[in-house]
Regions:
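OB-fold and OB-like single-stranded nucleic-acid-recognition modules
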Residues: 2-159
Length: 159
């Protein structure tokens, strides 16, 4: 009788695990296939210069993160103006522009999408541009006092 009870309990536990796994898998697929936000069609939260955005982060990183970043992944869409200091291509063949004034230690890194690369290819170092994108990371200071640029993704050139 004792063995029979254990088999029934084991069967119930296995059924519960399968049900929970199926629900978790279904939710994972739902999130994976959910449409991504079209950054270019969303109204910008603010228009700000690259220098002012960097200065805001250097002044109070926590306050700037509260203002621009969101835990749910829907961080603020910004229009950023600044001078192009470098143009690079990342591993995904996406253009990455750095907006900062000459002599500035840090700036704003703007990563374009494959579909918007063509709009950024006409830009040259020294051009003053207005770019729309979503903020992903503020100024990052590590323990060695190295600072990373503010990171903007899904960018496109406005002017």
């Amino acid at each position: 009788m004792f063995k029979l009870k254990n088999k029934k309990m084991l069967k119930k536990i296995i059924i519960v695990i399968i049900i929970v796994g199926a629900i978790g898998g279904a939710y994972g697929l739902y999130v994976f296939f959910m449409p991504h936000r079209d950054v270019q069609s969303v109204e910008a939260f603010a228009t700000i210069s690259a220098n002012d955005l960097v200065a805001e982060y250097l002044k109070d990183n926590a306050a700037a993160n509260l203002k621009y970043l969101a835990d749910d992944g829907d961080s603020k869409v910004l229009n950023i103006t600044g001078r192009v200091s470098s143009i690079e291509t990342d591993q995904k063949n996406q253009l990455v522009l750095i907006l900062k004034d000459e002599g500035a230690a840090i700036g704003v890194s703007c990563t374009f999408m494959e579909s918007t690369n063509k709009n950024a290819k006409k830009l040259k170092v020294g051009d003053v541009v207005k770019i729309k994108g979503v903020l992903r990371s503020g100024v990052d200071e590590d323990s060695e006092m190295l600072e990373e640029d503010v990171i903007i993704e899904n960018c496109d050139v406005l002017s």
